């Protein structure tokens, strides 16, 4: 067993050694399931306590209290495992956590008393927004979290107490599924599913992050974003399918208690019906992609259908936190200057059309209309347009149907307000979709710095930008769900 631990440690070191600042699509070949340390028995209920070792393939575990991984320890979960989390239990990660599901044998982390529902979804009637089990909370001593091919269902129960001493942003009462705060660590979430959250799916205060090829449904009750990295976090959010979010699908912000710029490549995502459940002031600035508070982002090749707002580059209320990263060049940054384009929009009413290029509702914006977008908003608004100005987008309603394989567009009135899950719909593109072949593969590169690439202890592959807009590519690459 010690030999297995040594081998695993060596693999972990190899994973970090494979990091680089270059670009391109790094892919690793799948390897057989591994075991770290001793096997964890599934006989009886696992009480709150410290755990390390391996949950074995295909077994079902029931958990009644917080699973804590101590600093220096590793918990590995093999393919096909189901973990039934009761009593609002969490994973408290001070060491390393590795979940290695596969496409044919995914892992499931769930609240066993809750069941998924299809059709119209509303807060107060759908338990997806209430939080069943808690989340995965990672402290500053957690160096590596790898989550692959895993269903995370009904998470987000409120933290009952502060799980560790934090210098970042976690506090009792938080309701995230994923939380990470080690600026030197790596967090990998790939090829997985998230169903139901009451608040943000993920909150990062530092770290090297790869969020890729996931499907996210019913996220945020009356507030909350999908993926929400804060200051000093860097990485990629790409090839994700995000439907039915309360606020934004993806957001970046150089704020919080972690110093440094937040920098992300945000590309080839599909956003559908996002931004309608946040009715507060922040609801007037939500919908698909939000870049704010001096964060830097590369936002390309995204397909945005029936969302409350298009890609939004925020200024700040009353001149505070004025956004400079799109006008200030910095050669030392991973992203030298914020840039965006080649994004595809479809809208079903005038209110959406009036915010394809967001206006200064709630706070000033500095989003420039782009000629490479579909529709061509630079041509539509004209050379005299000043960012933030109100305009009439009514003539854009119903144009550029992306031609999903199976989804009603034009949508029935109000359908975007309550259809918050995939159900039996298929968001792949038909062969004659106007979104095929309209993306860019050369205008930008993904971030690779600090992201390990390894079949077990890192990313399975940083997928390069795709030529088709959205997360599903006509050549079969991209999101595999």
Name the predicted role of every residue range:
Residues 23-59, 63-70, 74-75, 88-95, ...:
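Extracellular beta-rich repeat passengers
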Residues 1-4, 20-21:
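Positively charged n-region of N-terminal signal peptides that target proteins for export
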Residues 15-18:
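C-terminal motif of bacterial Sec signal peptides marking the signal peptidase cleavage site
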């Amino acid at each position: 067993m010690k030999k297995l631990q040594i081998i695993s440690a060596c693999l972990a070191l190899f994973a970090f050694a494979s990091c680089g600042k270059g670009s391109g699509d790094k892919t690793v070949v799948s390897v057989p399931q591994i075991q770290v340390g001793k096997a964890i028995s599934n006989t009886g209920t696992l009480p709150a306590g410290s755990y390390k070792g391996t949950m074995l393939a295909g077994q079902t575990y029931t958990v009644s209290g917080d699973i804590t991984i101590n600093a220096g320890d590793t918990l590995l979960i093999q393919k096909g495992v189901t973990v039934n989390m009761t009593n609002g239990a969490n994973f408290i990660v001070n060491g390393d956590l590795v979940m290695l599901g596969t496409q044919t044998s995914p892992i499931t982390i769930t609240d066993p008393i809750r069941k998924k529902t299809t059709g119209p979804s509303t807060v107060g009637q759908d338990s997806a927004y209430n939080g069943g089990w808690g989340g995965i909370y990672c402290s500053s001593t957690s160096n590596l979290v790898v989550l692959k091919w895993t269903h995370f269902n009904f998470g987000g129960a409120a933290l009952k107490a502060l799980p560790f001493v934090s210098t970042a942003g976690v506090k009792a009462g938080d309701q995230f599924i994923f939380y990470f705060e080690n600026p030197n660590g790596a967090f990998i979430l790939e090829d997985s599913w998230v169903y139901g959250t009451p608040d943000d799916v993920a909150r990062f205060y530092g770290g090297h992050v790869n969020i890729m090829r996931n499907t996210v449904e019913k996220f945020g009750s009356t507030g909350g974003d999908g993926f929400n990295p804060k200051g000093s976090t860097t990485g990629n959010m790409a090839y994700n399918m995000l439907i039915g979010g309360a606020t934004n699908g993806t957001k970046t912000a150089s704020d919080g208690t972690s110093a440094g710029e937040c920098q992300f490549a945000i590309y080839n995502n599909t956003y559908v019906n996002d931004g309608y459940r946040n009715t507060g002031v922040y609801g007037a600035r939500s919908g698909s992609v939000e870049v704010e508070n001096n964060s830097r982002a590369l936002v390309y090749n995204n397909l945005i259908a029936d969302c409350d707002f298009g890609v939004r580059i925020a200024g700040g209320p009353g001149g505070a936190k004025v956004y400079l990263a799109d006008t200030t060049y910095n050669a030392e940054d991973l992203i030298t200057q914020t840039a965006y384009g080649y994004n595809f929009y479809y809208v079903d009413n005038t209110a959406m059309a009036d915010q394809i290029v967001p206006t200064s509702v709630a706070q000033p914006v500095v989003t420039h209309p782009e000629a490479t977008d579909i529709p061509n908003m630079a041509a539509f608004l004209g050379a005299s347009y000043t960012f933030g100005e109100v305009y009439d987008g009514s003539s854009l309603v119903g144009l550029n149907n992306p031609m999903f394989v199976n989804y009603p567009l034009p949508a029935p009135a109000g359908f975007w307000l309550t259809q918050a899950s995939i159900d039996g719909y298929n968001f792949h593109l038909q062969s004659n979709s106007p979104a095929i072949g309209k993306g860019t593969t050369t205008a930008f590169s993904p971030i690779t710095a600090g992201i390990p690439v390894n079949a077990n202890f890192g990313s399975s592959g940083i997928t390069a930008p795709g030529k088709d807009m959205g997360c599903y590519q006509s050549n079969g690459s991209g999101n595999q769900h």
